[in-house]
């Protein structure tokens, strides 16, 4: 509704790419939120990071690149709840869904870079999100029915769509146009660290030594990966 992209004049291969990007985007979110129904948020986020870190490892060509990936992985593990992976309370289906979301995240990074280069501006993302919405709408209607059409639900859904999808995915698409996939994968490790800092500043949540060390590790990894990419 905010942007009216030009959707004609592109080769069929580019349109198929954008639709595939949208399908992966929808599957990633469905798998992740389904995992949240079964396992704690911290565990789900940690497991999902196998995706971007896997892309970073696959794209690494030097030992220094692997060092940044290892630092980011260590930081993410430090941010996971203590004992989260040692208990008997983890639902295997939830773990599997979180790992599946990570695989879709890896595909999202690769397809996002290709889509960003195949279309100008946000055109590719808009086509992808429309395709993703069309694919997920039947799932939502089957689970919630007419309740989805209530004014309160529509308003909340619009806010979530804007803040958790339209704005961040637009920014990520611009980043994917400019960065190698491996560097983007490492930079994604900043997300849980930034969340911890926001919790400290906005919500007054206390940061223990594990969280502080994790923030330092992922920040150093992000800076190191970015500088290495710029040097190349």
Predicted regions and their residues:
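Membrane-interface interhelical linkers
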Residues: 1-20, 61-67, 85-90, 116-119, ...
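Hydrophobic alpha-helical transmembrane segments
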Residues: 15-20, 46, 66-70, 96-99, ...
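Hydrophobic alpha-helical transmembrane segments of multi-pass membrane transport proteins
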Residues: 19-34, 77-78, 96-111, 138-183, ...
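Hydrophobic transmembrane alpha-helices of multi-pass small-molecule transport proteins
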Residues: 23, 50, 64-83, 130, ...
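Glycine/small-residue-rich loop that forms an oxyanion/phosphate-binding "nest" at active or ligand-binding sites
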Residues: 29-33, 37, 42, 48-49, ...
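Hydrophobic/aromatic residues within transmembrane alpha-helices
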Residues: 35, 40, 59-62, 115, ...
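Alpha-helical transmembrane segments of compact multi-pass small-molecule transporters, enriched
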Residues: 47-58, 131-135, 183, 187-202, ...
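Transmembrane alpha-helical segments that form core, pore/gating elements
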Residues: 55-56, 74, 86-143, 157
């Amino acid at each position: 509704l905010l942007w009216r992209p030009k959707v004609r004049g592109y080769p069929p291969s580019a349109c198929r790419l954008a639709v595939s990007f949208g399908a992966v985007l929808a599957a990633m979110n469905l798998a992740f939120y389904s995992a949240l129904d079964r396992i704690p948020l911290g565990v789900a986020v940690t497991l999902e990071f196998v995706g971007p870190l896997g892309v970073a490892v696959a794209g690494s060509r030097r030992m220094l690149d692997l060092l940044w990936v290892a630092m980011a992985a260590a930081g993410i593990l430090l941010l996971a709840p203590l004992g989260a992976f040692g208990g008997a309370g983890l639902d295997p289906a939830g773990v599997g869904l979180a790992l599946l979301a990570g695989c879709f995240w890896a595909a999202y990074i690769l397809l996002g870079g290709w889509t960003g280069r195949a279309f100008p501006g946000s055109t590719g993302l808009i086509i992808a999100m429309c395709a993703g919405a069309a694919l997920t709408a039947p799932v939502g209607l089957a689970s919630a029915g007419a309740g989805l059409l209530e004014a309160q639900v529509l308003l909340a859904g619009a806010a979530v769509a804007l803040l958790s999808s339209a704005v961040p995915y637009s920014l990520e698409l611009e980043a994917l146009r400019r960065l190698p996939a491996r560097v983007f994968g490492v930079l994604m490790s900043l997300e849980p660290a930034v969340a911890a800092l926001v919790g400290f500043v906005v919500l007054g949540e206390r940061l223990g030594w594990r969280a502080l060390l994790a923030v330092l590790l992922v920040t150093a990894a992000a800076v190191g990966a970015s500088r290495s990419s710029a040097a190349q």
